């Protein structure tokens, strides 16, 4: 095999964040069989999205809520999740799925989007989104690495859903400028 295949085969921990395509996760397709044969793998994390749940009209969801994606992106994430979870089910691979809410933190806040020309206003009555800070994501991943599961799914979000027009996170999303 090539060098990347050798690295994957010998890896103890793998974190996957590549967006899936219409066939699911490209890493699963290309390297899933190598990952299954690995004797060293202690933990595999797949970063997904809470978008797999679809629109629940402001109602709360949890890891047991049935997925019902309404976007192409969400449907592709569900397919990728199923691919990775099949390794956990069929081979007891230490796969963990992390469904991330809207990410905020340095370089990811509203000002960054405005400066990049990518800002969007989404204002719908009673529409709320969960969010998660980048540092909190890192803490969740580290906790999982230290206590790996098999086929676990985690919603990674704060417990403070807010409307998208809520700008209260700006002060912690962007550095103070002189």
Q: For the regions a protein language model found, what residue spans apply to each?
A:
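Glycine-rich "substrate-gating" loop/helix at the edge of Rossmann-like oxidoreductase active sites
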Residues: 69-74, 101-103, 124-132
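Glycine-rich Rossmann NAD(P)(H)-binding loop
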Residues: 123-127, 154-162
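Glycine/proline-rich active-site loop of Rossmann-fold NAD(P)-dependent oxidoreductases
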Residues: 78, 91-93, 103-117, 135, ...
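Catalytic helix-loop patch of NAD(P)-dependent Rossmann-fold dehydrogenases
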Residues: 57-97, 122
């Amino acid at each position: 095999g090539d060098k990347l295949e050798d690295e994957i085969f010998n890896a103890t921990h793998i974190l996957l964040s590549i967006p899936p395509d219409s066939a699911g996760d490209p890493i699963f397709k290309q390297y899933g069989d190598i990952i299954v044969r690995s004797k060293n793998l202690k933990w595999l994390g797949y970063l997904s999205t809470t978008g797999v749940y679809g629109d629940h009209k402001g109602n709360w969801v949890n890891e047991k809520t049935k997925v019902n994606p309404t976007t192409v992106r969400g449907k592709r994430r569900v397919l990728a999740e199923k691919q990775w979870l099949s390794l956990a089910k069929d081979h007891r691979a230490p796969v963990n799925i992390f469904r991330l809410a809207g990410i905020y933190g340095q370089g990811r806040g509203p000002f960054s989007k405005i400066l990049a020309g990518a800002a969007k206003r989404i204002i719908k009555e009673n529409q709320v989104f969960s969010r998660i800070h980048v540092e909190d994501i890192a803490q969740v991943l580290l906790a999982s690495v230290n206590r790996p599961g098999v086929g676990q799914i985690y919603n990674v979000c704060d417990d403070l859903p807010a409307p998208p027009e809520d700008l209260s996170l700006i002060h912690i999303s962007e550095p103070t400028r002189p």
